């Protein structure tokens, strides 16, 4: 009996499975929304784009929130959930206002409640002997549960560095990892944010002093060759995503990590894009527990090269 007549059906089935795989995956994003305060809140065009970007993601880290009145996230919840007749609703968890002086920022995580929930959270205390107060804005560490993904839970450590101290701050994330492991029985880690990890802020010779890079157990999804900046005049991989933990590394959807160029996607001029931010979001996907559970195409710690893109 010939198998040829069945080949169109098999091809269609494979395409369906691939589409289902993508639909069931969990998209995680990180976005520095430059100076996200009252003035940007009143820019309706910029806000429309920001909401579109958030809606692409199942969980998104927002940085550089400058909101002394705590209005930004409630406003976003209204835009995301207020007129929605769908069953999908967003929730959020936000840090306190962080910074050494009068200049303060907040980290916020927005997430789809049906897919993700918060298990625990804490603000990292930057008090190690000999290097007290390394972070300009201490990581707001959140442990998430995601019951429908292959990795059922993961810790996200966000970071927005000061450019001049990027090398030291990125290196210090290794100490944050150790601190979280002491507190929680967590195995899956995501470090992400605006690390300012490119161009003159982190020159090539500095990487040897960053434990997050020299330790091969930390897997970098956004490589040094990427450009996460909006301006055409710059090309720097400031924004990064780094994983730790075999389970979560193996759960990454192949070729899902990268930079989301919202300027191109939404056909904006450079000026219009800069009204939104001077950074592009970075992202990746985690496989669903129901999709390709036996796949051997996931990212491998052994095969992953430092600084390479998945």
From Swiss-Prot:
GO terms for cellular component: endoplasmic reticulum; extracellular region; nucleus. It comes from Rattus norvegicus. Optimum pH is 7.2. Active from pH 6.0 to 9.0. Monomer. Inhibited by zinc. Transmembrane segments: none annotated. Its EC number is 3.1.21.-. A motif (Nuclear localization signal) lies at residues 301-307. Residues 1-25 form the signal peptide. Gene3D superfamilies: Endonuclease/exonuclease/phosphatase. This is Deoxyribonuclease gamma.
């Amino acid at each position: 009996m010939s198998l040829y007549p069945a080949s169109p059906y098999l091809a269609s089935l494979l395409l369906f499975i691939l589409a289902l795989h993508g639909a069931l995956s969990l998209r995680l994003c990180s976005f520095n929304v430059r100076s996200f305060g009252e003035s940007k809140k009143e820019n309706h065009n910029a806000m429309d784009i920001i909401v579109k970007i958030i809606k692409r993601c199942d969980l998104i880290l927002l940085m550089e929130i400058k909101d002394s009145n705590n209005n930004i996230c409630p406003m976003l919840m209204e835009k995301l959930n207020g007129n929605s007749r769908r069953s999908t609703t967003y929730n959020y968890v936000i840090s306190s206002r962080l910074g050494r002086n009068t200049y303060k920022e907040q980290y916020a995580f927005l997430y789809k409640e049906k897919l993700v929930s918060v298990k625990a959270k804490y603000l990292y205390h930057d008090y190690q002997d000999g290097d007290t107060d390394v972070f300009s804005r201490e990581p707001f560490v959140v442990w998430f549960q995601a019951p429908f993904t292959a990795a059922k839970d993961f810790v996200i450590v966000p970071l927005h560095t000061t450019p001049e101290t990027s090398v030291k701050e990125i290196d210090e994330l290794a100490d944050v990892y150790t601190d979280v492991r002491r507190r929680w029985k967590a195995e899956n880690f995501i470090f992400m944010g605006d690390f300012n990890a490119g161009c003159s802020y982190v020159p090539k010779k500095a990487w040897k002093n960053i434990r997050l890079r020299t330790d091969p157990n930390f897997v970098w999804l956004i490589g040094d060759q990427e450009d996460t900046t909006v301006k055409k005049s710059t090309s720097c991989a400031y924004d990064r995503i780094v994983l730790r933990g075999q389970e979560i590394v193996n759960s990454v959807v192949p070729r899902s990590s990268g930079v989301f160029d919202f300027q191109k996607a939404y056909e904006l001029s450079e000026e219009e894009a800069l009204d939104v931010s001077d950074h592009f979001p970075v992202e990746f996907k985690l496989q669903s527990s129901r999709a390709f559970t036996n796949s051997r195409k996931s990212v491998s710690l052994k095969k992953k090269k430092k600084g390479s893109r998945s």
